[in-house]
Amino acid sequence: MSDIPNDVMAETSSILPYDFVKQNNIFGIDKNGEIKIYSTSELSFDIHQELFRYIGKSFEVEICNAEELNNLITSNFSVISQNSELSEELKDNFDLKTFAGTITATEDLLSGSNDAPIIKLINGILSQAIKLRASDIHFEPYEDSLSVRYRIDGILQEVLSQDPRLTPLIIARLKVISKLDISERRLPQDGRVSLSLGDKNVDVRVSTLPSTYGERIVLRLLDKQSAQININDLGLPQTILSTYKKSLSESEGIILVTGPTGSGKTTTLYAGLRDLSDSSQNILTVEDPIEYTLKGIGQTQVNQKTGYSFATGLRAMLRQDPDVVMVGEIRDTETAQIAIQASLTGHLVLSTVHTNSAVGAITRLRDMGIESFLISSSLKTVISQRLVRRLCDSCKVKTTINKDIADLFGLKHNLEVYDHKGCDKCNGTGYKGRIAVAECVNVDKTIKDMIHNEKSENEINEYVFKNAPSINSSCSDLLIKGITSCDELIRSNNIKEDAFVSVSYTHLTLPTKRSV
């Protein structure tokens, strides 16, 4: 086994089409008329015959290091590399579905005819996703098709269904783009790539997962502009925004943001950090993963392979003389304990907890074994938020609220509301964009005493939302104003159908009945 020469690694172009290179994990070069094939093992008789048919002359086979070969293939066939720019596929008249229908799978991998269409298809899928504001792209192989789905406004929508024979070609191309090991199909892999769309820069986080009919790939699209959002542009109600800003001005304590996955928690934390960031403060983070880079802030990333966890990172950061620390998520007792101690010793700590309500964060910390007197001493503010889809203004239709739903949300019977329909402007979904709804617990002296005296979650809820809006009352306001639909409220609040036949709705923080 020999190393691939540096001049080959740096400058050589493949004489073989990508499909054949990928399928057989080989690479061919023509150096001054002499053909050399690099491979990690001896070639089979069939591959020898195919190569001779394509090249038309004799060639030499060089056995090489697997990692070097993978790097050589990646560097030569990566069409969307760091900071590359999509071009033709970004045009408004580019029809992704029509183009995808023209691509056919070929059995002859040496024909080379598939390379350009596959590249253009992937470029089109990426550019279309960015234009439609998709947060994720799913490539899902099945026995009879390759399904491509976008997650738009939190909901998955299928946009393409391709010939299953194209699956290995598309998946391999995506792995090359992301600089992943194309020969490794048995283990999950993670990668990252940057794309440029006019004046919009997007980071793409790539995750692969082996499955029955090939590797599944999910691309998470991270708009770099989202990291630059101003705290005043978060869409939080003015009372909650004022509470958040006041808490950020404190020199110590814990600020928590809660909500389900995809509810914008990280964006809220990043906006808070940007508001704090100046040369007079040392701000450090430990994240899993780092979603956006923040200027002037020291960011670190969890690495389970090396044992660098949230708890390990937080403990290490406290030895770096920080003023403010951000922990991506408090998941376990150890992290919670260190965060509490840090907040009691002159540090401002920002983090998230996976609960569906603001007061639920207090219960979650108790369940982790944190004593109530420590929670009451350290906790400053809890913001709970979620994102609700906006009705499309171009096609929303008037309707009358269902009696059961009116009762569930404390609204007047026969209230005129709006429902979704679907049109070209909203891609047939009836919704376009999302709006944040939030609730906030400002831990004042009364709440401190309630936490210290171990009052229940329901008792604290009753006090907090006696004169303040909850998430559910905020959702009801959106319904009354025609901003969202009944179906969306039921979905976003995770209400099950059996709630409509239940005589008790105590699991919801509902507003009092209103005569609107």
Name each model-derived stretch.
Residues 9, 48, 66, 70, ...:
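Alpha-helix initiation and N-capping motif
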Residues 1-54, 190-198, 202-209:
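Polyanionic, low-complexity intrinsically disordered segments
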Residues 111-128, 132-504, 508:
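Short, flexible helix-loop junctions that flank or precede catalytic/ligand sites
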Residues 4-5, 10-13, 66-124, 132:
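Charged, low-hydrophobicity low-complexity segments
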